[in-house]
């Protein structure tokens, strides 16, 4: 895997959107995450799908729609303050 890419399940866990990597993998495997890269939108259906800084993700979590832009991949699952530096919130798309 390239240095500038990371698996979606690992990144969701590092960014603290999921408590465990297994839950992050389940979110991806169920097709509940949308990825926008270079203007092309696709549904993520595998936990092994790679993401890069600049990609945008949209997913439902905790009954809320979450839209973010990936700013960094991170090296570890750090404290919440460190996790918040991995992404920038976006306005969710209109339903």
Placement of each model-derived feature along the sequence:
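Strongly charged
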Residues: 2-10, 14, 25-26, 34-95
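Hydrophobic ligand-binding cavity/cleft-lining segments
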Residues: 31
